Amino acid sequence: MSGLKLTNVSYSVGEKHLLHEISFGQETKGITAILGPNGAGKSLLLSLIHGVIKPDMGLVTWNGVSAQKTKLSRGYVFQTPIVLRRSVRANLAYPLQITGKHCPATIDDMLKLSHLTPLADHPAASLSGGEAQRMAIARALITKPEVLLLDEPCSNLDPASTKLIEEMIRNFVADGGSVFISTHDLAQAKRLANVVLFIESGRLLEQGPADDFFAAPATQASRAYLRGDL
């Protein structure tokens, strides 16, 4: 992956300003955690980075090309996983079918990676929350994206499911992928991230190495957030 760049990005719904003139450049491979209190704009920022929505003002580019026009491959997993009314195997096959890349061996590899091989032919609707989320991540990975975007991937999941999902994320990064993850789980951000973006009330207040952010947050808002007071 080369560079992601946001330049003076703003987004509003009606009269409500949700993101305000956000600018940053990101070329570091690895895992970037987007942190901030409820309603800060984390999920919205993730959607803009992906390109599924366009900013009202400003530019979002990947390698100098707009997020809507770039050919950079990206996988996106929502907080509530989308489950098709078919088997787990068929859910994983779907992205390959629509891209004309159907490959049973690839599906088997993803079933193994997500620890879902024993459930391959079960209805996806019967999966637990953690299983469904692992399936959603595997489905996002199956077309071999360069970038993976995750919106609260471990929200309300048990520790065992969280551990398996973090293992999937680390494996993707070890293979050269880049991850942007929105999370409320500070412990998870510490475990995974090498870069942190901190936003509050739609404004980007901090960007930098995760170790620096957690050791010496630079703003009053980020200090309050880490104390649990925001």
Regions flagged by a language model, labelled:
Residues T183-H184:
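H-loop/switch region of ABC-family ATPase nucleotide-binding domains
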Residues L148-D151:
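Catalytic Walker B motif of ABC-type/P-loop ATPase nucleotide-binding domains
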Residues P104-L119:
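Conserved ABC ATPase "signature" region
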Residues P123-L127, E131:
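Conserved ABC ATPase signature
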Residues L35-P37:
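The feature captures the beta-strand-to-loop junction immediately N-terminal to the Walker
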Residues P159-S161:
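Helix N-cap at the start of a conserved alpha-helix in ABC-type nucleotide-binding domains
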